[in-house]
Each structure stands twice: as structure tokens, then as C-alpha cells.
Design a protein with these regions (language model features):
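Terminal-region recognition feature
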Residues: 1-180
Length: 180
């Protein structure tokens, strides 16, 4: 139940949280719904996507009802994880804030010296990598907005400015099923 989640996750969405998540998921008794409570203010988007994939696979292949309960803070990578759940299975506690952010490059780009053709090749590779990351971000925005009143375009426009959304605003936008 929402009052007693089977899995409680708190902290950075990192390899440690992922290990805890998979361990707790494996401990769940077969049958009924699984409620996952999450509080996170930071994290690795790739870890969040991996956790989201686990949820999708379990829901689609394992035929399990899985419910998301955001508590206090669901920032950035946490919102990516929340996107794995259909709107009808997303809940936030009253004081919870969502933070939708734009992906940032973790490392600066450096070009090795060499011939102009070599440098041009490096630039082309970097451009393809950046485009792949932009495409992934659009997929993330699509998952976040699916079933809601928020468009992908609105996410693209507001995410670069770190869009903070209260639980009641998220409900009004159709991003969640209910505020609890």
C-alpha cells in the first residue's frame, strides 16, 4: 500500500541505489502490487534509465502492478525513473517537488591534435554523440509527458531552467494520478 511501500529508496541514484533496488525488487513476494517510494535530489541518468527499464520489463513481461510514490524531492534522474510508470500509477506526497532538468555533458570535449582531417573526424564523432544524447533526452521527455497535459515542447523549453513542479501542480498538469 502507499502507506507501507515494499521498496523505499533514498539518496543519490547511483550504482549503490541500483544494487539496493534490484535486491529489494527480488525480495518482493509474487502477486500483488509493488509500491516503490523514492526520495532523490541527484543521480546518474543512465542508472535511472536502467532502473526504469527494470520497471517496464517487470510490468510488461512479469505482469506486475508497480506503483511509484515520490516523497519530498524527486529531482532530475528521479523524474526519469518516475517516467517508467504510467500516470495512473504515479503518486506524490503533498510536500514533494519534482525538478525537471536538461541533460548536461559531464566532461568537457577535447580534441587531440593532428591533421585537419583527423580533427574534422573527431568533431563529427562528437557531434554524433551529442545528437545521440539529444535524441535520448527527447525520449526521456516523451516518457515523462506521456498521458499528461505537458507537451514535449514545454519540457524542452522549461528543463534548461531547472523546472520545479509542486505536487499539486503535477496533479493539475496530469503528470501524476494523485497527491497523497
Amino acid at each position: 500500500s502507499l502507506a507501507n511501500p515494499g521498496i523505499r529508496l533514498y539518496g543519490a541514484m547511483d550504482a549503490k541505489m541500483y544494487a539496493e533496488f534490484t535486491e529489494r525488487l527480488a525480495e518482493q513476494t509474487p502477486g500483488g502490487p509493488i509500491v516503490i517510494a523514492l526520495t532523490t535530489m541527484e543521480g546518474d541518468p543512465e542508472i535511472a534509465r536502467s532502473m526504469a527499464d527494470d520497471i517496464r520489463l517487470l510490468r510488461d513481461r512479469g505482469r506486475r502492478e508497480i506503483i511509484f510514490l515520490g516523497k519530498t524531492a524527486v529531482y532530475s534522474a528521479g523524474v526519469l525513473f518516475m517516467a517508467a510508470f504510467p500516470v495512473s500509477h504515479r503518486y506524490l506526497t503533498r510536500a514533494t517537488k519534482l525538478l525537471v532538468t536538461e541533460n548536461k555533458r559531464a566532461q568537457p570535449m577535447e580534441l587531440a591534435g593532428g591533421s585537419l582531417r583527423s580533427v574534422a573526424s573527431q568533431l563529427e564523432h562528437a557531434q554524433r554523440e551529442i545528437q545521440r544524447e539529444i535524441d535520448q533526452e527527447d525520449e526521456d521527455y516523451r516518457a515523462i509527458s506521456e498521458g499528461s497535459n505537458v507537451s514535449i515542447q514545454e519540457l524542452r523549453e522549461k528543463a534548461p531552467h531547472d523546472w520545479s513542479i509542486t505536487a499539486s501542480e503535477a496533479k493539475a498538469m496530469g503528470l501524476i494520478a494523485e497527491v497523497v
